[in-house]
A protein has these predicted regions:
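Cell-envelope and extracellular/periplasmic
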Residues: 1-222
């Protein structure tokens, strides 16, 4: 069975995260399997057959995010270098930003993404035989990153509150950690950042839960 935590990026009086029980578990079948995490599915499949115990997967993930999105401010500030690189620099950059300014930047970014998607659709229609690697070389990458701000899902500690905290009270046997690409620009800090994630999650889950660290099978199309 599979449960996917709603990917709510920001919560205020107008945007509320639905209670976790409203979402419900999905049974793995031909209709739902495409929604499953591939890594999680194969792990659950082999465990189910090897130890004959039903497996439930809870997906707490969002693509393009740093490890700093998944821990709270207290842990982000435990390490001075991580605090400087991931926390201080981000919030200093937006400290004078108004909500109207942020909303304007978000609208501009969405328009750039829309135009990019139109280019991709035209390219695929014109060159149906070409793969995604060639498309990226010819058309370019998706506009990234998005604008910084209080509503940015990549903000430090953001998804910790809007996603992880919604499920941390539920007991689990292990965490499959499949993240890190977004932190390559600060790779020298990643070991320390990951250690903080592990400590923070274990504290919130009230258990010395094991973390299974998954590597990317490949990082570059070339």
């Amino acid at each position: 069975r599979y449960y996917e935590v709603p990917q709510i990026e920001y919560e205020d009086e107008n945007i509320k995260i639905p209670p976790i029980r409203n979402q419900g578990w999905q049974i793995c079948d031909n209709q739902t399997i495409n929604d499953f995490s591939a890594i999680g599915y194969y792990l659950a499949y082999y465990l189910r057959h090897d130890i004959d115990i039903p497996i439930g997967l809870i997906a707490v993930n969002k693509g393009g995010t740093s490890g700093s999105c998944w821990i709270n401010e207290t842990y982000l500030q435990k390490n001075q270098e991580i605090k400087k690189v991931y926390y201080d620099e981000y919030y200093q950059a937006i400290m004078n930003q108004t909500e109207a300014q942020e909303d304007l930047e978000i609208a501009k970014y969405k328009e750039r993404v829309k135009q990019y998607q139109q280019k991709v659709a035209l390219y695929q229609q014109t060159y149906p035989e070409r793969n995604m690697s060639q498309l990226k070389k010819d058309v370019g990458h998706t506009p990234w990153p998005g604008p910084r701000g209080k509503k940015d899902f990549c903000r430090p500690a953001g998804l910790y509150y809007t996603m992880f905290k919604k499920i941390c009270q539920y007991s689990g046997k292990a965490v499959i950690w499949y993240q890190g690409e977004e932190d390559t620009k600060n790779a020298y800090l990643y070991h320390q950042l990951l250690q903080l994630v592990i400590e923070n999650w274990r504290e919130d889950m009230k258990a010395q839960i094991p973390f299974i660290i998954v590597q990317l099978p490949e990082y570059d199309d070339d």
